[in-house]
Amino acid sequence: MTTATPSSPSTAPLPTRRAMFVHAHPDDEVISTGIALASYAASPDTHVTLVTCTLGEEGEVLVPELIHLRADRGDQLGGYRIGELAGACAALGITDQRFLGGPGRWRDSGMIGTPANDHPRCLWRADLDEAAAELVRIVREVRPQVLVSYDARGGYGHPDHIRAHELTRRAFTDAADPSFAPQAGSVWQVAKRYETALARSSAVAGFEYFRDSAAESNPFAGLTSVDELGVTLVDDADITTELSAPHFFEAKIAAMRSHRTQMSVDGFFFALADGIGQRAWSVEHFVLAEGARGPGDGPDGRERDLFAGLVCEP
């Protein structure tokens, strides 16, 4: 995989349609947007850019022989996860992956309330103008019509997910403002900003299937309701966009397997894939947060394409 950086932009002309996905850590890209990434990356008229904000240094390590990489030991997990991310990108067909500000510029902040929140380089403590300028630089270079990240809570309250949301919102506005970071390139107006969404019906389906499962790291174990999960659930009526691509199911699973320190092959994610399988991992949902909604399809009226309603130009 060729990894571009803001300091060394590609000079080759980009396809007409361009989408940028902003994620907090390696592995986040595949969980909520793996189908979207793979399907758009496979389209010859679409360029996909993945921006990863940190190296995920504070992540857990599920491989016993790699436990020495943990932040509280050798603190080498971030470097290892660069390789995992490269493997995931290869599985998804992504050729343009960037780290915000370059690899290691901002560090994984850990879960809220942990000592990692106080690390001077963590994304949670980043100067927002500085971090936003780095994302704006990439937006102005790539000129995406579509920008994708998380909701205001980051899906489940992780500080880096919240920051990724804030930075993406800033980039949507600031990339079009000639007074903001003029050194970061010519202005560009993104047409649509989306937030990833976990549809309530999808969570309920998983809950009903797995609540009594003995699968390792089953998040439903001991719960009586999906509302106890601690994640943001979006009512089905509020979902604006649904992407379904069962033929990219295997690519998504292969990308998940690449993140071996984070996802146990005996754990919940793969048990879910083997259980309700394509119903769980072949459909992804989004909420259009900014921009004009395109034409819908089917009885639910949802968009079936993040580019719905757009006339894309070079």
Curated annotation (Swiss-Prot):
Binds 1 zinc ion per subunit. It catalyses: 1D-myo-inositol 2-acetamido-2-deoxy-alpha-D-glucopyranoside + H2O = 1D-myo-inositol 2-amino-2-deoxy-alpha-D-glucopyranoside + acetate. One of its GO terms (biological process) is mycothiol biosynthetic process. Its EC number is 3.5.1.103. Zn(2+) binds at H25, D28, H161. It is an enzyme of class 3 (hydrolase). One of its GO terms (molecular function) is N-acetylglucosaminylinositol deacetylase activity. Keywords: Hydrolase, Metal-binding, Zinc. Its cofactor is Zn(2+). InterPro entries: GlcNAc_PI_deacetylase-related, LmbE-like_dom_sf, Mycothiol_biosynthesis_MshB. It comes from the Bacteria. PANTHER family: 1D-MYO-INOSITOL 2-ACETAMIDO-2-DEOXY-ALPHA-D-GLUCOPYRANOSIDE DEACETYLASE (PTHR12993:SF26), N-ACETYLGLUCOSAMINYL-PHOSPHATIDYLINOSITOL DE-N-ACETYLASE-RELATED (PTHR12993). Catalyzes the deacetylation of 1D-myo-inositol 2-acetamido-2-deoxy-alpha-D-glucopyranoside (GlcNAc-Ins) in the mycothiol biosynthesis pathway. HAMAP family: MshB (MF_01696). Belongs to the MshB deacetylase family. This is 1D-myo-inositol 2-acetamido-2-deoxy-alpha-D-glucopyranoside deacetylase 2. The lineage of its organism: Bacteria, Bacillati, Actinomycetota, Actinomycetes, Frankiales.
